[in-house]
Amino acid sequence: DEYEAAARKLASLLGIEFCDPTTFDAERLMYWPSCCSDSQYVYQVYDNPFCSLKGLLGMYGDWHDVSQWPQVPGADAIERRRLAKQEDPTTKRGIIGAFCRTYSITQAMEKFIPGMYEETDMQGRYTYTGGETTGGALVYDGDLFLYSYHSHDPCCRQLVNAFDLVRLHMFGDKDDEAKEGTPVN
């Protein structure tokens, strides 16, 4: 969980506006940065420490608090586009629509997965209790959707409705066994 907080802080010192929003995904840590196909990748190796993890994290009031992490300018526009593409889950037919008409995100949290998320002081922000960071789960669009930045959360990096929130927490391990193209309903 330290990687994203440290990477964002370092990027803010160097110029976060030059970073792609996916730069801070933990899986990026193990790969070389990309470059255009017709360009030469240039890098240099230094055997001295570049910066201190403890020092970077110490620059935060509380590095566990996701709301303190620097953001790439315009990254919120990506979230708005993602939300705009989502169909209102209460208008869906079948069990998913029925579930979402019966339970909002917060009602589903309380009824089916109590204790998995804790409300923070900031309206619409929750903390996934199975992780180390705080305030990384955001409720959107009048309690219809949740998007989680918590890396240990089964809903991490997914915009989910109430049905999918519960499904991923209670039965997400079954997805590994499902064949590609299996409908969720």
What residue spans do the PLM features occupy?
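Short, small/acidic-rich helices and loops at N termini and domain boundaries
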Residues: 143-185
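Residues in well-ordered beta-strands of folded domains
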Residues: 30-33, 125-129, 149, 167-169
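Short, charged low-complexity linear segments at domain edges
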Residues: 110-135
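Short glycine-rich, low-complexity/disordered patches
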Residues: 19-26, 116-125, 175-185
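Segments forming glycine/polar-rich beta-alpha architectures that bind adenosine-containing cofactors
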Residues: 137-141
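Residues in flexible loops and secondary-structure boundaries
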Residues: 40, 134-136, 156, 174
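DNA replication initiation modules
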Residues: 2-118, 142-146, 152-153, 160-161
